Amino acid sequence: MLAADGHRIVHSTRHSPIELGKDVITVDANDAPCAYQLKGHPGGRLTLQGLREIQPQLHELTSLAIPFPELRHVHHRSFLVTNGLVEEEATLAIEQMNAANETDGYPERRLEVIQRGDLLAMASRLGHSLWPTEIQQTHLLLEMLVERGDGLYEFERANRMLRAILGLEAGARPNWSAAEVRRRITSAAILVSLSLKNYDARQNHFASISAWVQFSAAAIAACERFQISFERNARAAVDIALIGIRDALIDLAREALERDPPLVEGDVMLDAAFYRARYTLVLGLLSLLWFWCEEEGWPDDLAREELEAFLHEGRAQLYLWGEAAIPQILAYYWFWRRTESGGRVDGLLLQLLTATVETTANKEPKGLPSPYWSFEDVTRHALAPILGFDQDPMAEETTGRMSFFAESLLHLLVRTNWKQVCRQVWPDVSRIQFVEFRPRSRWEYCLSFSEHGRYRQVQPPMRKEWSDLIEEARSIRCEQAPEPLIGRPMLHALFVVLFPYRASPEVVRTLSRAFNRAWLIPPPVDA
């Protein structure tokens, strides 16, 4: 509601010590900072006794500066928000507190109250801009609300919901104004938030990350398709989503650091088949969180040294179960490369490339399952002799003849200037086809599933000049993705971790340039 009212969201609650009584921090349409303390009293009342119990938090809310450098020197408006009613005695106490602050020379420490009636009035005023009225989306939402919440987020169902509400379905583009698209982006955000109800109740942090990454990409896609300004129509919603993603990553990190043994789910023996794949995913996600914290600052409840130790100690658990795991391992490689240098680090690239072009004793390509197959699919395929071949989703799959990642991994290896190593691996590289799927348009690239596009298949020559490989590896031009996604490397990297088939060679080259400062060939080319 605040975003729809013209506020820019700066912070949304994680309930950590650094908040200083401020659950939500915004900058309103007049550039005035606002801080909100949220209290739940559904169907109830905030009594005088209840007010006294939260008095220390209210003091922090009104008197302590907002803990953000750009807002620290401007005093903020302070709001107590409750979804209940405030009793008369509590209202009188708040008025007396405000009067005392004014008498003492601190009129700026005034506490304002937003209670249930005010929230309902705001919702009524925003009307359809707050809540989607499309029956189909409500039906999809109800389907998602019955999910238990302890599994993976339902990408396919969410994709249908987002495409319908944001005008991203196949066929002619709806004739919507920018205001209508903006309204629908806000509505979609609310639907996503509601769809996470059961996942949040089970503290399923990965589901929350997945949902908000998918939403953010879809919001960018809507602006791209309707050719409207992202800054004016979707940035506020995406910024809020990014706050939620970062908070969920921090919560995931805290849980991973506190577990002993780390990352085990349920029975240790039964979990053994899934343990390393889960560990690899978490290492990739938390590697990206490390970059995020390095860029925006470390929260008080997550120590840099602890996270780095966890990431380094987990290296032995990296598991290349299929090409879908490569973006996860690349994220880890970028972290490792930033914190350590040397051939041992870049050797991880060689291991990945070697695995994608591996051959049998008869020089037949062996390779890995394509990025369209999940770990569950790969596991069912491996267990088909036990579970039955009718349960094998990959029964018709032929691996090894082509690779979605060999070309991009080769280019990253070329950037290390390992000429002799590339020469040695080239015979195996030249036996497979480089393949990628290019969606028809930039907005379709942002979707988790796209029906339209073309496959690009290239058979590498038996011999290739080193200078030609260098020229290819230097390119950091990315034409496939919209600029708002390219300009947010953290979001883009999370997007390809979730949807690895979007990690085309140009996307991998561009992301690697954003996260990896090492560059041992001539300067990059963005043209």
Label each region the model flagged:
Residues E295-A527:
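Long, low-complexity regulatory tails in eukaryotic proteins
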Residues Q49-R52, P56, G149-E156, I240, ...:
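Alpha-helix boundary/N-cap detector
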Residues M1-H76:
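Catalytic centers of nucleases
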Residues H41-R45, N83-A90, W336-T339:
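Short acidic, S/G/P-rich loop/turn micro-motifs used as interaction or catalytic elements
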Residues Y153-K366:
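Extended amphipathic alpha-helical scaffold segments
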Residues M1-A4, V81-G84, W519-A527:
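Charged, amphipathic alpha-helical stretches
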Residues E60-A236:
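Acidic metal-coordinating catalytic centers involved in nucleic-acid phosphodiester chemistry
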